[in-house]
UniProtKB/Swiss-Prot annotation:
<feature type="transmembrane region" description="Helical">
    <location>
        <begin position="1"/>
        <end position="21"/>
    </location>
</feature>
<comment type="similarity">
    <text>Belongs to the sodium:solute symporter (SSF) (TC 2.A.21) family.</text>
</comment>
<feature type="transmembrane region" description="Helical">
    <location>
        <begin position="158"/>
        <end position="178"/>
    </location>
</feature>
<protein>
    <recommendedName>
        <fullName>Uncharacterized symporter YhjB</fullName>
    </recommendedName>
</protein>
<dbReference type="GO" id="GO:0005886">
    <property type="term" value="C:plasma membrane"/>
</dbReference>
<feature type="transmembrane region" description="Helical">
    <location>
        <begin position="318"/>
        <end position="338"/>
    </location>
</feature>
<dbReference type="Pfam" id="PF00474">
    <property type="entry name" value="SSF"/>
</dbReference>
<dbReference type="GO" id="GO:0055085">
    <property type="term" value="P:transmembrane transport"/>
</dbReference>
<feature type="transmembrane region" description="Helical">
    <location>
        <begin position="74"/>
        <end position="94"/>
    </location>
</feature>
<feature type="transmembrane region" description="Helical">
    <location>
        <begin position="388"/>
        <end position="408"/>
    </location>
</feature>
<keyword id="KW-0813">Transport</keyword>
<feature type="transmembrane region" description="Helical">
    <location>
        <begin position="362"/>
        <end position="382"/>
    </location>
</feature>
<keyword id="KW-1133">Transmembrane helix</keyword>
<feature type="transmembrane region" description="Helical">
    <location>
        <begin position="188"/>
        <end position="208"/>
    </location>
</feature>
<keyword id="KW-0812">Transmembrane</keyword>
<keyword id="KW-0769">Symport</keyword>
<feature type="transmembrane region" description="Helical">
    <location>
        <begin position="40"/>
        <end position="60"/>
    </location>
</feature>
Amino acid sequence: MNAALIIIFGVLLLSIFLGIRAQKGKDMNLEQWTVGGRGFGTVFVFLLMAGEIYTTFTFLGGSGWAYGKGGPAFYIIAYGCLAYILSYWLLPAVWTYAKQHKLMSQSDFFTKKYNSPLLGILVSLVGIAALIPYLVLQLKGLGLIVSETSYGKITPTAAIWIGAVSITVYVMVSGIHGSAWISVVKDIMILVVVLFLGVYLPIHYYGGFQDMFQQIETAKPGFLTLPESGQSVAWFSSTVLLTALGFYMWPHTFSASYSAENPKVFRKNAIIMPLYQLVLLFVLFVGFAAILQVPDLNGADGDLSLLRLSLQAFDPWFVGIIGAAGLLTALVPGSMILMSASTLFAKNVYKVIAPRTTEQQVSALAKFLVPVIALISVYFTFKGGNTIVTLLLMGYSLVTQLFPALLFSLLKHNMVTKQGAFAGIIAGVGAVTYITMTETTIGTLFPALPQAAKDLNVGIVALLLNITVMMAVSLMTRKAKSAAADQAA
């Protein structure tokens, strides 16, 4: 057993210990298990939401896109900053309403706002459908990280199974408390590792950042800028907008906001989080540094650029630290995803269908579903071949369809009816499904459009269709309701 393997397993065991110990002295009812009794302060909410947002994508997807795509990879930094600005106003309003009505999941929010259990079921199913590829992303990344940094001693298959079992155990025992404590370890490690790699590797291989970018530009002219077509300025802007709108629409991120002790926590975090977003810049630097040093990583193999360059540059003990940090970037969000998906199904699907179910039975079912959902995700992890970023964008396309109905629900006078919200989400999700399965672009849908329009992220089409259907159905149902009221009078 080499030094890297010892460190990786040591951190894994520490994480499991912290995760299980976190429930000590607490009555783990459904509210404690899912939202921590709504007692987390600024630091814990910051670490928890950072733990969910900065995932294996931070380690592999960001550097992989810098390596394979060049300039377009900078969208990764931009959309988070825009989302944090939105959160300054969005999350306090969500938290206040959730606390007032003792809500525990994202679906609870939609159910209560629109007085529609059926809409709550739809939101749950959309959330679960988006969370599966997101969990697959974490497990796929976990397999790559542990396998590479253990020098092949642990296969990706074994790493995925070990990670899935570890997450399942501490989620079932401690819920959100386990995730919060492991976030502390994870955030310290990822900050140190990513900042070091992002500074050291460009200097080590190129002598500095300017020399690195000059050499890349010489070898691959135009690679570091946005192209005139394809992933152009139009694509960049539309993708940043879409992903920013979907940023807090993930069920696990949305419900994690309920755990804060007061709404001021979110405003403080909205100021701090953009600084934390700069961590991603150093991840991109590693991807850029790998372009000329680890050539010929094609397609999905680009996600290995950070790991392959690290193996080439460092001794096994430090590679072990990198692997351990990468391991935690999968465990923390993976645990939140598992908990959210199981709670959504138990509380917002099963309990609606079987209303006589008690809270204790819902809690037991949610915990029972944790290993079931983990097994489903492991299956898709082994079957799928998508890159890390592709999986993330697919999930974002789905959850973004929930944003219009949420936004209108926060207005003082909501013009959207429950029928309109339902129809809009169905239309948007249907469009996303068709676009994903057929690999449609705006260019293939509307070939006569100018190039800038054809380069727009095709998710714009799904979102516009969602809003159009939502408003049209709301208008019709309002008129029908008004006509019925007039007849009754």
